[in-house]
Curated annotation (Swiss-Prot):
Family per record: Belongs to the ycf66 family.
Keyword Plastid: yes
Gene: ycf66
UniProt cross-references to Pfam families, sorted A to Z: Ycf66_N
Main localization category: plastid
Cellular compartment(s): Plastid, Chloroplast
Protein name in the entry: Uncharacterized protein ycf66
Swiss-Prot/TrEMBL keywords: Chloroplast, Plastid
One GO location term (cellular component): chloroplast
Amino acid sequence: MINIEFGPSTILGIAVVCGGILLYITRTIKPEISRDHDIFFSSVALLIGGILIFQGWRLDPILLFGQMLSTGTALCFIIESLKLRVPKENNKSLFSTQNKNNSNNRIIKFQPPSKYDINLNQRGKKEKKNNNFQLKENSKYTKDSLVPSNWNDINISSIDYEKPIDYQKK
């Protein structure tokens, strides 16, 4: 039995259907911000909107109020999500894949911004010059890795953790 009554549930159903259609249309208007899962959520919105239009007359007032609250919350999250999306071309990360021609392209190399490059003096402490940090090539650290070059020589089992650390030792 189909019984359509023009009431608050019909208006809510029409709003949900329009939201689903608009979510689907963003795929053709702005494909750079569309995602693959938008089609799924658009289909779910069309189904829910259709149910509210055709069967909304059966809702009690408190159930209709709950449906209005959940629909309003979902629409607010959809709008916020669309506003926060950035075009796929401009979405660049600090991480880049290393050696793309290599068969193991799952290795990730961190490329820090230039203002965070480090300049180390002979004692291994940071030096600040002109508010720019730069990494010396002849230091014991390299640009690709900030691990000491003699890391294999460190014997962790020989360290006595019960004695206090002597910071005055040279």
